[in-house]
């Protein structure tokens, strides 16, 4: 039967769902039932009968009318759905669900009688912006910090330092202490999970331990043991430890320190590709300035898009949220794989479900940002110029190695996406009020 014989009506539902009600004529129902009998006859094996030669009455008796009807109905729903979306030029983005459920429909299905059922599926939403111009946006300023040059140089000195044993003095800030320790909670005396070690190198300068621990070690001598009182921060990652007082029995087993290289041209060559300290400082300054500029631009763009999203009206379909959540989980898995982790054993079904659920807010936010920008491009008729695309493509190809294998279509699409993003951000900056806000103070959380 052709799709023209179907009666189809549609109704919009919340969350960008579309209800499609299909009425299938009786003759098509009969044809589906007869085809189900033929199909089952070809596949079933019954003693005394060749495959495909089982009499109809025997087949119905052996399989039962319900199984035959169920097979016919499944195929009927599938074919009717495909014909209906083609007939009505519909573009669903998910598989359909029966509104009434399959079992209920099966009870009312009688070959030869007209059959009506409703299927629901997600469709692409239609995003709208309440306003595009005169938006008020805020961004956090990023200031180039010249002192970071010295910090980066000192970090390089530490990495290139020679570790030597300490003799004849107590532990000082900046030393490397080899410790044995055992931690217990002060309130109930229970042992702290992960709070013990037989021999562990602890840097007495980087503040990675909880407050009070390193301070208690400073001043100790090799071979000395003592009890140090500490308290876990209120924002400590492990919830059951937050704010609790603890006692650590600590033994200083060995003590080492770093002999730092001189800050000379030889160090510059060893630590970088620069020949002199002056060149090294100049290079680091430029890198930090470029980084500050990139972060400043990113903050400005984030502020503008946030203001735009506040103007967005869109009903996100579940199919898109699930797909975006999967993308985020796959990105996480790829990062773990790059670190050499066994992703297949690590990512159990339970973990994947938890990650999918936890990534949902970020997935929804990503979709809203994307739809807001798409709606802006449509509302303000922002389009790309072919010559700009070609020029950018040539620039990108120049930076690619000669043996790089790149899909031309994917490369062109990536270039178009970048250019459109630049145009949209430029338009927003021109047509919005962007206000700088003071940077938030950096938290100094110790873990």
Swiss-Prot record:
Keywords in alphabetical order: Cell cycle, Cell division, Chaperone, Cytoplasm, Isomerase, Rotamase
A biological-process GO annotation: 'de novo' cotranslational protein folding
Enzyme class: isomerase
Bilayer-crossing regions: none
GO molecular function, one term: protein folding chaperone
Gene Ontology CC terms, in alphabetical order: cytoplasm
Gene3D superfamilies from the UniProt entry: 3.10.50.40, Trigger factor ribosome-binding domain (3.30.70.1050), Trigger factor, C-terminal domain (1.10.3120.10)
Catalytic activity: [protein]-peptidylproline (omega=180) = [protein]-peptidylproline (omega=0)
Record family assignment: Belongs to the FKBP-type PPIase family. Tig subfamily.
Function comment: Involved in protein export. Acts as a chaperone by maintaining the newly synthesized protein in an open conformation. Functions as a peptidyl-prolyl cis-trans isomerase.
Protein name per the record: Trigger factor
Organism: Synechococcus sp. (strain CC9902)
